[in-house]
Curated annotation (Swiss-Prot):
It comes from Rattus norvegicus (Rat). One of its GO terms (molecular function) is cadherin binding. A motif (Nuclear localization signal) lies at residues 608-624. Gene3D superfamilies: Leucine-rich Repeat Variant (1.25.10.10). This is Splicing regulator ARVCF. The modification Phosphothreonine is found at residues 103, 105, 637, 866. Residues 95-123, 233-254, 267-331, 593-623, 844-926 are annotated as: Disordered. Expressed in optic nerve sheath envelope (at protein level). Expressed in heart (at protein level). The modification Phosphoserine is found at residues 268, 333, 336, 344, 346, 607, 865. GO terms for cellular component: adherens junction; cytoplasm; nucleus; plasma membrane. The gene is Arvcf. Component of a ribonucleoprotein complex containing mRNAs and RNA-binding proteins including DDX5, HNRNPH2 and SRSF1 as well as ARVCF. Interacts (via the extreme C-terminus) with FRMPD2 (via the PDZ 2 domain). Interacts with CCDC85B. It is found in: Cell junction, Adherens junction; Nucleus; Cytoplasm. Its main location: other. Residues 771-955 are annotated as: Required for interaction with RNA-binding proteins DDX5, HNRNPH2 and SRSF1 and with mRNAs.
Amino acid sequence: MEDCNVHSAASILASVKEQEARFERLTRALEQERRHVALQLERAQQPGMSSGGMVGSGQPLPMAWQQLVLQEQSPGSQASLATMPEAPEVLEETVTVEEDPGTPTSHVSIVTSEDGTTRRTETKVTKTVKTVTTRTVRQVPLGPDGLPLLDGGPPLGSFADGPLDRHYVLRGGGPAATLSRAYLSSGGGFPDGPEPRDIPSYGSLSRGLGVRPPRTGLLGPGPGDGCFTLPGRREAFPMGSESGPPSGRSLPEHFQAEPYGLEDDTRSLAADDEGGPDLEPDYSTATRRRPEYGRGLRARALEDTADDTGELVEERPPFPAATAPLAQPERGSLGSLDRVVRRSPSVDSTRKEPRWRDPELPEVLAMLRHPVDPVKANAAAYLQHLCFENEGIKRRVRQLRGLPLLVALLDHPRAEVRRRACGALRNLSYGRDADNKAAIRDCGGVPALVRLLRAARDNEVRELVTGTLWNLSSYEPLKMVIIDHGLQTLTHEVIVPHSGWEREPNEDSKPRDAEWTTVFKNTSGCLRNVSSDGAEARRRLRECEGLVDALLHALQSAVGRKDTDNKSVENCVCIMRNLSYHVHKEVPGADRYQEVEPGIPGSAATSQRRRKDDASCFGGKKAKGKKDAEADRNFDTLDLPKRTEAAKGFELLYQPEVVRLYLSLLTESRNFNTLEAAAGALQNLSAGNWMWATYIRATVRKERGLPVLVELLQSETDKVVRAVAIALRNLSLDQRNKDLIGSYAMTELVRNVRNAQAPAHPSAHLEEDTVVAVLNTIHEIVSDSLDNARSLLQARGVPALVALVASSQSVREAKAASHVLQTVWSYKELRGALQRDGWTKAHFQSASTAKGPKGTPNSGGFDDSTLPLVDKNLDGEKSTTRDVIPMDTLGPDGYSTVDRRERRTLGSDSIGDSSEKELLKGPGPAVCSSDHMEVIGRGPSGTDPVLGPGAPPFCVGLAKPLVYLALPSSLLS
């Protein structure tokens, strides 16, 4: 066995030595041949050495050839050779790969490393393949005119060289790492020749695809056709007749969009060794032009030995021009086909390569008109990348009229083009600048987006469309446009299917749960925005078939799955809150349910007895008999209207059954925006002098909702405290609710008044609107209720109110606090206790001398006269010496809490349709959709109507609709 191994090793060693000897002989033969060819070229150039012997970089021609190095690589790999200038005797280089059938097969291979050690590896080798590189020198026949004949051999620069990686010399142009696969000549130099073949054009080609179509004429091939012409022969061709490839630039690389929400950043798929793409709008195929700062050739490129204006262009193995396939638009340009499988650095990172420059914005926009579909798609994707978080680029795109081009591409027959164009529009529609939104509207962007949503079945396209509409819906003039063109489509294509609601449910099947998809989130956010536009917008949404039903079903599904903190739930609750606004005035047939006075029948019993009877609402011990308890469970004398069929559509908005849904959200959700919207919905439904508001107030008490609301007064979120305080004020119009709230909520209300002066911690500080809302709730509770006034004294509310009047720099806060103090002093039964505590009449008769919000005198037109005091006795009789301050002095109607003039001072509109258009103030969450999208974004400033939830406006009695502010960028990821 050992002898066999020794014999095998010896035979292998002998074979290796034999191969080394062959390569050595081959090397010597090639070197000898190289010298022979160099001498021939030197003799051929001697006649013109005196005038044109200096070429390329200034070196003599013989020296240039002496510097040529033949790089031989290992067997099986390519050989890197350089072409030679054309001489009267044209040379051709070839490489042949052949198999040696005489080489014995072996099952053992030995690899010798550089340090001389030998490693033995057992393999199964059937035959040995070797590569023989040869150089052939042959004469090219010349015609009568002295020009080479076409049939004499392939011209220099043709692609008969097989797999060689060569450098070819071109006339004009620049360092073309990307060459056009085919171009058509203008025909200036060969007017008498036949028309060139019609070669298909391509939007962008890979660097190595260097096939040039042979262009022949009566005079043979012209310069620049892949054949090199000697300097001495160039006079045969007029300089003005030379034709070359278009002096353009390569087309953009293939950019793959990446969703970041409602504004995305798309990164390029460029080659690792290439710079950013240069774009030329006029050509479907073009070479990359030489940068102004130099040619920037590769290190292994040789100096041009023929002409100073020539360029060395690296080529890859060719494909036959006649059989090259057409570019596939869906796969992007051919220039990216060899790179789509791997991600490469972004466009910004390619700037390190000094040879190429990034495309200019006008060039990118011009490519949107390109006849090749992949070019359009790539240009739109690159434009989306440029616009990401760049307001300047967005503004320039509008100024250069790029938005109509993108909108037109939304109806393009190619899905990829539509998708990329919509992605660019999503980023362009996000941001503080509303001019882009207006420009998209002016060029028909909203109808085009709606058409695309109806036709698209690809989920990514639907996300892009709905995200763009979400961004556009933050612009006030666009809200009704979206409703007119897209309400039905958004409802029936997205809201209803994704909510799980079925118009005709199958009794045997289980109800479907809602699907919290990105499309549903974007669509609900868009409807959340448009629902705040005004009375007409609310009417259209209420009457949209299936919308209210689907939203309520989605919320019930969220409560059932205890998934109440996501953005989709927040959007749905905000829509319900907005649609509940002024529901007692705007729904059809509301006049039939109006009441003369608020309150429920049978509430004339004494307040003290009602407080004891209903103490169990807050967990206390009941102090009433079984008969009274049964009467309470039956809503006392409440008589709910009888129905012959189930409520549907907008009727579901004000049914008592929705109270349980809102209370569940208030109990389970930890999303402050959802809490605020749910409390605002109860606030809206409990307002107004109509029968359904009476039922809602009683239902909140029956469903044990008062303790839930009182607990939320401890929230550290200002807007939640404000919404809950106003909801409690509207609920206190029910006398039973007033007694319960006065007994169990007064402590929390007073604590919030103290936080307005000296907050326990920074997050507990309340805004002016919230403080005024709390004070007006206290005023409503203590009015006509001696027991509640006593509760205020026991909670030490008087010192807090007096201090607020004396120290507050807000005239609204001081005035609201003065109203409460005067109401307390009006009860004669309490004056003795107040005087014993050191309070005098002067403390309850304060002048409104407070400063404005920042310490400046208030300019709202208020007088500084002392408010009159109102005396009340236990029976609620009015004093004959003083007039009662009517509720009208506190606001525009019986449910308002702030003077209408004061709201105008703060820049707010009066309650009603005009006030609903007030944009939300204050910081919003950090998302985008203009959150989904610059994903969906930054928090809004006071005047930025960007998307996303934000601080709601101050609500006067009735909850105002939420204007959808900017979406936070945290949701993009």
